[in-house]
């Protein structure tokens, strides 16, 4: 299945999951899996949240930032991949001067 992120209406999600500023997302959701291209501008973040019935894979396309994962902190840059398994918590933070652009997949686990 082809997914055209450029042809999608971008969703602007302010203070997403309790984060700072606006999370911009081009998102495909078939009810079982969310597949998205996301953008966090400088100083923006996705707030700390727990994946109860799903997991998340984040691949950084461009920019730099960090993930708070459970009790640790991880630096991310273009080419980095972060995995948050079911039952774990994380947040994504753009602490750089440029946009943080990423690809993410969130499959529901049954």
Which residues fall in each region the model found?
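A short, N-terminal "cap"/entry segment at the start of jelly-roll beta-barrel domains
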Residues: 1-32, 47
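Glycine- and acidic-residue-biased ligand/ion/polar-headgroup-sensing regions
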Residues: 53-65
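Short acidic-glycine-tyrosine-enriched beta hairpin
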Residues: 72-86
């Amino acid at each position: 299945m082809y997914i055209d992120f450029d042809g999608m209406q971008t969703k602007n999600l302010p203070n997403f999951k309790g984060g700072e500023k606006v999370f911009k997302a081009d998102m495909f959701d078939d009810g079982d899996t969310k597949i998205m291209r996301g953008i966090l501008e400088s100083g923006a973040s996705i707030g700390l949240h727990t994946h109860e019935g799903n997991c998340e894979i984040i691949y950084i396309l461009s920019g730099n930032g960090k993930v708070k994962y459970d009790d640790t902190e991880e630096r991310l840059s273009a080419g980095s991949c972060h995995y948050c398994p079911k039952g774990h918590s994380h947040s994504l933070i753009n602490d750089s001067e440029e946009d943080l652009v990423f690809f993410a997949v969130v499959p529901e686990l049954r």
